[in-house]
């Protein structure tokens, strides 16, 4: 039986980049745990900011550089930089290191797989039709320039007694092509019938190798 590989891990170093950029044998476990904590703090503090990814770099033992990719940079930066300043201070106190926080705006959130998955999850939690939410995400992504989109939901859809899986695909999605830039995102919708998993693949063309 064929096994599925993670679309991002399959393309690392070719058409995808690492979210964590450092190497240290001595402090590996400690730093890895810190990275998870940093991502959790950032996403919990700015859950309404449309955060897609958090990149972490450690150029040396005394500093951490955090780059946040978001659809709403103003929410994170705050008035006159107040919010981002508070975030930096809180992280420096927690990590006991110098922290640099950068914010990158996502120009087209409709073609960001993680944001699309979270948007569908939000609609399902508000009791919108999962089919309508999926079809709207597909049309929005294609309208904004995506070459191909696949959306899959699984769970007790519409409160059904038996869990099932449904998916829609529009355009091309070459999952076995390493140079293909395929963005991948997941989210979970919590409903009164249980959780519904959402997976999104967005093909944006080929990278120059």
Swiss-Prot record:
Record GO biological process = translation
Q: Which SUPFAM superfamilies match?
A: Prokaryotic type KH domain (KH-domain type II) (SSF54814), Ribosomal protein S3 C-terminal domain (SSF54821)
Give the UniProt keywords, A-Z: Ribonucleoprotein, Ribosomal protein, RNA-binding, rRNA-binding
The record ties this protein, via Gene3D superfamilies, to:
3.30.300.20, Ribosomal protein S3, C-terminal domain (3.30.1140.32)
UniProt-listed Pfam families: KH_2 (PF07650), Ribosomal_S3_C (PF00189)
Chain coiled-coil ranges: none
Q: Does Ribonucleoprotein show up as a keyword for this record?
A: yes
* MF-aspect GO terms: mRNA binding; rRNA binding; structural constituent of ribosome
Q: Which GO terms describe its cellular component?
A: cytosolic small ribosomal subunit
InterPro entries assigned to the protein according to its UniProt record, in alphabetical order: KH_dom, KH_dom-like_a/b, KH_dom_type_2, KH_sf_prok-type, Ribosomal_S3_C_sf, Ribosomal_uS3_bac-typ, Ribosomal_uS3_C, Ribosomal_uS3_CS
Q: Where is the KH type-2 domain?
A: 38-107
Positions of transmembrane segments: none
Q: How does it assemble?
A: Part of the 30S ribosomal subunit. Forms a tight complex with proteins S10 and S14.
The UniProt similarity line reads: Belongs to the universal ribosomal protein uS3 family.
Summarize the protein's role.
Binds the lower part of the 30S subunit head. Binds mRNA in the 70S ribosome, positioning it for translation.
Can you say what this protein is called? Answer: Small ribosomal subunit protein uS3
Tell me what organism the protein belongs to: Pseudothermotoga lettingae (strain ATCC BAA-301 / DSM 14385 / NBRC 107922 / TMO)
């Amino acid at each position: 039986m064929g096994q599925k590989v993670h679309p991002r891990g399959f393309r690392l170093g070719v058409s995808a980049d690492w979210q964590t950029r450092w190497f240290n044998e001595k402090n590996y476990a400690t730093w890895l745990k810190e990275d998870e904590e940093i991502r959790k703090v950032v996403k919990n503090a700015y859950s309404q900011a449309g955060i897609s990814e958090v990149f972490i770099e450690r150029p040396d033992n005394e500093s951490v550089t955090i780059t946040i990719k978001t659809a709403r940079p103003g929410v994170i930066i705050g008035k006159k930089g107040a919010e981002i300043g508070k975030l930096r201070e809180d992280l420096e106190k927690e990590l006991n290191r110098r922290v640099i926080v950068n914010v990158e705006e996502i120009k087209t959130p409709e073609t960001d797989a993680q944001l699309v998955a979270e948007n569908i999850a939000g609609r399902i939690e508000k009791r919108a039709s999962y089919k309508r939410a999926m079809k709207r995400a597909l049309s929005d992504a294609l309208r904004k320039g995506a070459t191909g989109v696949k959306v899959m939901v699984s769970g007790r859809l519409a409160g059904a007694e038996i869990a099932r899986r449904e998916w829609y695909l529009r355009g091309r999605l070459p999952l076995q092509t390493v140079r293909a830039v395929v963005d991948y995102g997941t989210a979970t919708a919590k409903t009164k019938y249980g959780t519904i998993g959402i997976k999104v693949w967005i093909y944006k063309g080929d990278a120059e190798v």
